[in-house]
Amino acid sequence: IFGYPIAYAISRVREDIRNGVLLLIMLPFWTSFLLRVYAWMGILSTTGLVNTWLQNWGIIDGPLELFYNQFSLILVMVYAYLPFMILPLYTQLLKLDHRLLEAAGDLGASPIKSFLTITLPLSKVGMIAGSMLVFIPCVGEYVIPELVGGPENLMIGKVLWQAFFDQNNWPLASAVAVIMVLLLVVPIAIFHHYESREIEGEKA
């Protein structure tokens, strides 16, 4: 939802602005993943930056519960993995032949119709690649649910960890591991299918 509009906007701006935005997107990769998660803990806690700012401005009387809930889990997951969606999409959109859009405009197609019939289908491989890069690590994610999500917000990676190391429940852990593998095989097969079709199309 967020990755496509951002990638599309980056691909349409001037090159100097584009390079600056890409640098900002890549900047978090130069710092520790764990440090970035801990930074969000400081921002969202009851004494963190958001609550302090809202209380100082008189918007709220007491601190909001922004931490250890589904909101904080989704927010930090999106922050952590959004670049993995943006970069493949940006690369695919940058390769788009804009003469196709000009031709569609000359033939009377509106910008929305040109986007839906040309830009969106031609960026399908980038969407699939980005979805793969996000989905695979998210399935096994343990750090963010453990540090940010709290005990009530479970993900497969956290369930697997608890079954193995906390409960010593090897049958349950093995079953969860098999489910995780099956969840990963399907999108990998889909991505391989579309990638093979694109390679064949380029050769043709």
Model-found features: residue ranges?
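Membrane-helix interface segments
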Residues: 13-21, 50, 69, 99, ...
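Hydrophobic alpha-helical transmembrane segments of polytopic membrane proteins
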Residues: 73-76, 132, 154-191
